[in-house]
């Protein structure tokens, strides 16, 4: 049952590790009061706990046998600052566009520790990857395989590659972010034999060096068995490649997808336990197949960036809406919405929100938190119990917004993208400035 105390708690498995509510009710992250940040930088505002982000990088590195085995999935959230943090923690980086590559290189990230993804890379992207000495390219189609071989030959280089495999696992996740079943755009089918044919073609290509296979069962996955089943199926292909082609592939990239908690009712996947079980299982399976166990690589993005960040909004209007004869819902409008967080509208995602400028002490009421866009689906929190005293001028924060929020943001209704700041040891630093109308108008021809 919702209580006044619940409204003011900050669930540790949802909020940044350095988030604290003070005796006066104000929430701080890394010692910095969130209302002060809102006043200084404006709202909406993304606030990244740098030490939280870095500590999750280290947790992943420890779990999977070293930082070089962990590739931060930059699609979750990437800036030059983020790329530098990832570099300083020793992790590798995976990118999925030519501009993500550009951001990483602009930050000074070593190209040799970059892995490139994408189902439709094209000549320009492939050439940039080869010219800059990117460590791995994950091949997604036969056409791309031939094109990369051609591009690498033109540059006089041998490019290390992995083959993306669809092992046919139906991950327990949203349809749009499940990536390992058959009827979707990514990779080569294991069941049809096209994955083996791709591996054979890559092995025979003069300017490609096949170093491993890649698979990704989906995002926001909480069933660890899916990872082990995918590994088992893909290792069967390793055995086939070894026996028929005489090649021992040294790497197995199992992607990311480790689920995090967005609400107090959810529990994040225990990555340390999953990693231990997965690495043990891979070693055992490889031994049973009579092959050397490949080095396991992983690609967490959300599990690192997501919990490290909150988004601060200022509350605007509130209204009570009669839902039926015996129910009223409180609508709370904030100064952002689907332009800075499309996930609730796109995936039906849920979030945890708290007043961060004071203690909330009102009675529990059914509440819907909405944005300011001209769209009825502009909803951040659909139907939860919140205090009745949330009012105009309050600062409200959503937790776990570090992944796929700014990265998927838009200028819908000509809203400008929010600023992003990092906090550490009682101080803040601007990572990305807030966009302005001049930024929008600058694109006009």
From Swiss-Prot:
Name of the coding gene: lysA
Active site, renumbered: 374
Induction: Up-regulated by arginine and repressed by lysine.
Cofactor field: pyridoxal 5'-phosphate
GO biological process entries: lysine biosynthetic process via diaminopimelate
Function, in words: Specifically catalyzes the decarboxylation of meso-diaminopimelate (meso-DAP) to L-lysine.
Note: Both, substrate and product of the catalyzed reaction are critical for cell growth.
Modified residues (N6-(pyridoxal phosphate)lysine): 75
CDD domains associated with the record: PLPDE_III_DapDC
Protein name, entry field: Diaminopimelate decarboxylase
Keywords: Amino-acid biosynthesis, Decarboxylase, Lyase, Lysine biosynthesis, Pyridoxal phosphate
InterPro entries with a match to the protein in the record: Ala_racemase/Decarboxylase_C (IPR009006), DAP_deCOOHase_LysA (IPR002986), De-COase2_C (IPR022643), De-COase2_CS (IPR022657), De-COase2_N (IPR022644), De-COase2_pyr-phos_BS (IPR022653), Orn/DAP/Arg_de-COase (IPR000183), PLP-binding_barrel (IPR029066)
Molecular function GO labels: diaminopimelate decarboxylase activity; pyridoxal phosphate binding
Pfam families referenced in this protein's UniProt entry, alphabetically: Orn_Arg_deC_N, Orn_DAP_Arg_deC
